[in-house]
Amino acid sequence: TSDSHRHYTEGGSDFWPGEYSKTYVKAVPSHADILDGLRHGRVFVTTGDLISELDVVVQAGGRRAEIGEALQFARGSDVLVTIRVRDPDAANAAGRTPQVARIDLIIGDVTGPAADREAAANPTTRVARRFTAEDWRRNGEDIIVTHTLSGLTGDAYIRVRGTGGTELEPSPDPAGEDPWSDLWFYANP
């Protein structure tokens, strides 16, 4: 949506840049660090201002890594994952104040070059845990969840996504759907 051609209020089907979808990069305010953040996955995207901050920290064996970093740990170790999102109380561009309904922790195996370069998905990728309000704690606008990935025996990546809705998996939007009622956020591995 950042390549806006014609706004929906003018008969088009698009939004102004940053009005609906936003990309956040964890970086100091310099061109070089922003590019470094993009290259190394210190990024999350959100629609409709569902969230305004996201932190992911993994810990094992006295070591820790944050979003976009790698964690080295002994095979078979338990890895503690802590996810913090800011669920802002402020209204978005549509005048609504969406609420996070669910956060998904996704994991997949890192196995090297893909055997099928045409495949659009990693067959090992799966939802490790779905969190709802019953599973998290709040600290003001922040939602915090933790989960232990037990007995990891190989290289893996994690991703985080969340929604303000009830769909288990994102699906294509039907024609005429209100985009402000189908909000998601995604974090890079």
Language-model features: locations:
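C-terminal functional module detector
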Residues: S2-P189
